[in-house]
UniProtKB/Swiss-Prot annotation:
GO cellular component: axon; cell surface; dendrite; glutamatergic synapse; postsynaptic density membrane; presynaptic active zone membrane
Membrane-side (Cytoplasmic) residue stretches: 561-626
A GO biological process held by the record: regulation of synaptic membrane adhesion
Protein name: Leucine-rich repeat and fibronectin type-III domain-containing protein 3
Keyword Cytoplasm: no
Location within or outside the cell: Cell membrane; Cell projection, Axon; Cell projection, Dendrite; Synapse
Reported modifications of this chain: N-glycosylated.
Coiled-coil spans in chain: none
Spans of repeat LRR: 84-105, 108-129, 132-153, 157-178, 181-202, 205-226
Region feature (Disordered): 382-425, 590-626
Biological source species: Mus musculus
Length: 626
């Protein structure tokens, strides 16, 4: 009996033999399906009509599908502590905003689908924490800006990046160049106008590059393209081949795209948009010899300029060519000039010296270069002594204009500047412009017999008021051309080029025939129209006079007709019958009764009853009537 109490005391110390209880899981969100029977856990909520990310998500889930809903934003707390999530789909929602750090806890995430939303930009903190991300799908959004550091955390692991169907005009090309493991890069259907040289040189694992339907006019050659074989069709291509797609771009087919034409490609959709001679033609049907460039020609440069020291000066240089030449400036000391504290170089060929110094005087050289060659022009700058300080009683505070003489400019420099300003650049002996009026000019050039194989002549000209270059293609047997539709009172720079076939290379080349400058006559000033208030008052007076005259004529006609009909209206004069008054005599004597005048036979008798204050007659006294 003593053993029983001892056993009762030892019973609480015995180990529990029941199995361990599983961890309590979160309930499945409403309208969602949760697969919790087997690992990994999945939460599936596609097309559930959700307005936000459900707060009761199981944080142990490895897959979360929230596609085809109405979620407008992703907040920081929506996906917090989901460290085991591998796949996240937010496709086809209405997401406009992703909070910074919204994916910071998703360090195991491998695939993120944000396509079909309304994102307009992607900042540096919105993808922070995705250190294992491999697939990033951002297509069919409204992205217009992509921050340079937006992909920093996933740059080493990203394999698939899709930015297609957005509004991207620029990309952080330096950041894209760090995606060393990317296999597929989709940039199609955006607004990209240019690609820098070497943008893809470090993407050694790139297998597909799609830049279809952008605004690219040229594509610079890249070491990646020359190192790998390129095929347009992915089917049947070897594993190491690069699939390259550039269709739907307005390509400018000149010598800069010869490298692309030499590649062995099939069934692609590239077409030429320019120059006009090749516009609309299939890219691969254009012969390699037709991809030509035109060397630059300097069409306008500043005349010799004289300014006092300390004042600004602007040197201008304009050049034309295909492709558009790039203009650079070289100082009199032989240094290449660029943007600095004292100088600014603009893309249109203008060099602005903010503060001139005596050592700046000399000959500046303008160099216009493109893929076909280069052209140079010299501009003289004379820097005079600095002006004295303005006096207190000075009546003018405006500095003299560049190139105009003033009291501080040496006489020689002033006269030289005035002479250059008043004269026009000399005309090339080979090209003459005659019979130029207000809107037309006749251009003539000599025969180019020393140049064999001339196909045509090209005339390039523009006015001093704008930089738009106008081209005219002339047959090879012509020696003159009449330019029409010119603006009156403007100065034009014109060059004639001979397009011929180079016998050495077999390619089409151009050779300058000559340039000329001419001015159209000012248009005749038309006669001034009458002043508007004066014209209006005159019209009112004239109309009033006509109305008054009409009224007077009408009144005169009425008076005339009234007088003709004896003072009675014409209608009533014809309708009234003559009436005679007959009265009886009180003394019984009946006097003679005056008879009424006989009516006209043609006029009908009018039966008119007239009541008179007279004595009645008897039957025997009734007058005999007709």
């Amino acid at each position: 009996m003593a053993v029983l109490p001892l056993l009762l005391c030892l019973l609480p110390l015995a180990p529990a033999s029941s199995p361990p209880q599983p961890a309590i899981s979160s309930p499945c969100p409403r309208r969602c399906r949760c697969q919790t029977q087997s690992m990994p856990l999945s939460v599936l909520c596609p097309g559930a009509g959700l307005l936000f990310v459900p707060p009761s998500l199981d944080r142990r889930a490895a897959e979360l599908r929230l596609a085809d809903n109405f979620i407008a934003a992703v907040r920081r707390r929506d996906l917090a502590n989901m460290t085991g999530l591998l796949h996240l789909s937010l496709s086809r929602n209405t997401i406009r905003h992703v909070a910074a750090g919204a994916f910071a806890d998703l360090r195991a995430l491998r695939a993120l689908h944000l396509d079909g939303n309304r994102l307009t930009s992607l900042g540096e903190g919105q993808l922070r924490g995705l250190v294992n991300l491999r697939h990033l799908i951002l297509s069919n959004n409204q992205l217009a800006a992509l921050a340079a550091g937006a992909l920093d955390d996933c740059a080493e692991t990203l394999e698939d990046l899709d930015l297609s169907y957005n509004n991207l005009e620029q990309l952080p090309w330096e950041a894209l160049g760090r995606l060393g493991n990317v296999n597929t890069l989709g940039l199609d259907h955006n607004l990209l106008a240019s690609v820098p040289a070497g943008a893809f040189s470090r993407l050694h694992k790139l297998a597909r590059l799609d830049m279809t339907s952008n605004r690219l006019t040229t594509i610079p050659p890249d070491p990646l393209f020359s190192r790998l074989p390129l095929l347009a069709r992915p089917r049947g291509s070897p594993a190491s081949a690069l699939v390259l797609a550039f269709g739907g771009n307005p390509l400018h087919c000149n010598c800069e795209l010869v490298w692309l034409r030499r590649l062995a490609r099939e069934d692609d959709l590239e077409a030429c948009a320019s120059p006009p001679a090749l516009g609309g033609r299939y890219f691969w049907a254009v012969g390699e010899e037709e991809f030509v460039c035109e060397p630059p020609v300097v069409t306008h440069r500043s005349p010799p300029l004289a300014v006092p020291a300390g004042r600004p000066a602007a040197l201008r240089c304009r050049a034309v060519g295909d492709p558009e030449p790039r203009v650079r400036w070289v100082s009199p000391q032989g240094r290449l000039l660029g943007n600095s504290s004292r100088a600014r170089a603009f893309p249109n060929g203008t060099l602005e010296l903010l503060v001139t110094e005596p050592e700046d005087g000399g000959t500046f050289t303008c160099i216009a270069a493109n893929a076909a060659g280069e052209a140079t022009a010299a501009v003289e700058l004379t820097v005079g002594p600095p002006p004295p300080p303005q006096l207190a009683n000075s009546t003018s505070c405006d500095p003299p204009r560049d190139g105009e003489p003033d009291a501080l400019t040496p006489p020689s420099a002033a006269s030289a500047s005035a002479k250059v300003a008043d004269t026009v650049a000399p005309t090339d002996r080979g090209v003459q412009v005659t019979e130029h009026g207000a809107t037309a000019a006749l251009v003539q050039w000599p025969d180019q017999r020393p140049v064999p194989g001339i196909r045509m002549y090209q005339i390039q000209y523009n006015s001093s008021a704008d930089d738009i270059l106008v081209y005219r293609m002339i047959p090879a047997d012509s020696r003159s051309f009449l330019l029409t539709d010119l603006a009156s009172g403007r100065t034009y720079d014109l060059c004639v080029l001979a397009v011929y076939e180079d016998s050495a290379t077999g390619l089409t080349a151009t050779r300058p025939v000559g340039c000329a400058r001419f001015s159209t006559e000012p248009a005749l000033r038309p006669c001034a129209a009458p002043h508007a208030p004066f014209l209006g008052g005159t019209m009112i007076i004239a109309l009033g006079g006509v109305i008054v005259a009409s009224v007077l004529v009408f009144i005169f006609v009425l008076l005339l007709r009234y007088k003709v009909h004896g003072g009675q209206p014409p209608g009533k004069a014809k309708a009234t019958a003559p009436v005679s008054s007959v009265c009886s005599q009180t003394n019984g004597a009946l006097g003679p009764v005056p008879s009424a005048p006989a009516p006209e036979p043609a006029a009908p008798r009018a039966h008119t009853v007239v009541q008179l204050d007279c004595e009645p007659w008897g039957p025997s006294h009734e007058p005999a009537g007709p």
